[in-house]
């Protein structure tokens, strides 16, 4: 099965905050194997339209798939859903790679620039931008002061370290019942 950290990451990435509580039991049913949306609704005691909304969000994210079949007696379509655990891993790795890329860009920007700030907290400028403003805040006219951004650099490095060392490169999932 997928571990708790990966499941929480999936929910955070795909499901809205309002749907989070309802999504967990839907995901738990889905992870047990192929199941219809009606069966999920019965097992979770959630309204069918809520279950379907969550399932379609998972489908849009590529972590769930469905097969449509027609009931010969009623002529109604039945949707049998399946969880795609390998897609979860791919999605989360992609998202984490994007976060790492953006953090590296932010780190490079902070390390390669000198900053000046308005003493009243209005703006933060790079040296070039502050020069264009004659080291004067365009909002209040106060002089700008040099800003030591070493704390910001350290915070970015710490966050980057968390993402680079969190083990998402080695996510393990086992096959879900097919």
Swiss-Prot record:
Keywords in alphabetical order: DNA-binding, Transcription, Transcription regulation
Domain HTH TFE/IIEalpha-type: 3-89
Keyword Transcription regulation: yes
A GO term, aspect molecular function: DNA binding
GO BP annotation list: regulation of DNA-templated transcription; transcription initiation at RNA polymerase II promoter
InterPro entries reported in the protein's UniProt record: TF_E_archaea, TFE, TFIIE/TFIIEa_HTH, TFIIE_asu, TFIIEa/SarR/Rpc3_HTH_dom, WH-like_DNA-bd_sf, WH_DNA-bd_sf
Keyword DNA-binding: yes
Coiled coil location: none
Similarity section: Belongs to the TFE family.
Domain notes: The winged helix domain is involved in binding to DNA in the preinitiation complex.
Description of how the protein assembles with itself and partners: Monomer. Interaction with RNA polymerase subunits RpoF and RpoE is necessary for Tfe stimulatory transcription activity. Able to interact with RNA polymerase in the absence of Tbp or DNA promoter. Interacts both with the preinitiation and elongation complexes.
Name of this chain's protein: Transcription factor E
